[in-house]
Design a protein with these regions (language model features):
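Two-component/phosphorelay signaling modules centered on CheY-like receiver
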Residues: 15-33, 98
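Acidic catalytic/metal-coordinating carboxylates
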Residues: 36-37, 62-66
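Active-site beta3 strand of CheY-like receiver
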Residues: 48-54
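Receiver (REC) domain active-site loop signature in two-component systems and cognate sites
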Residues: 59
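C-terminal output helix
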Residues: 90, 108-118, 125
Length: 129
């Protein structure tokens, strides 16, 4: 699957993380929108559904897990790659139980992120628009 034109959403409360991930994904020919909160991302869904979402686990307000739960409750099958700075060993299983594709622990390499997104895109049915 080619990355050209596929829309990826980045949801992280830290602006530098959103900027860095957005830049990396754009260099890989993805279209990217960055959101500073889960609520902001969820509000965008009626307008445009991403092919994949990158979700921070821990955010103020609604967490990445809560975003994923709302997506699942709405039967919105968007592949999710979770990211975290936490070293909690239970998070890997929690991500899978929540329906996430996988968990990347910060800091991670550009290559690992791109491989994770590519793998996630092979598992879902998000929109290419």
């Amino acid at each position: 699957m080619t990355s050209a034109g596929l829309y990826i959403a980045v949801v992280d409360d830290e602006a530098p993380v959103r900027t860095a991930l957005g830049r990396l994904l754009r260099l890989a020919d993805y279209e990217v929108a960055a959101f500073g909160s889960g609520d902001e991302f969820l509000a965008s869904l009626p307008v445009r559904v991403p092919a994949c979402v990158i979700l921070d686990v821990h955010m103020p307000g609604i967490s990445g897990f809560a975003v994923q739960a709302q997506l699942r409750a709405a039967n919105c099958d968007i592949p999710a790659v979770f990211i975290t700075a936490s070293d909690d060993p239970g998070l890997d299983a929690a991500v899978l139980a929540a329906g996430g594709t996988l968990l990347l622990r910060k800091p991670f390499t550009s290559d690992r992120l791109l491989k994770a997104v590519s793998a996630a895109l092979g598992t879902g049915c998000g929109s290419k628009s």
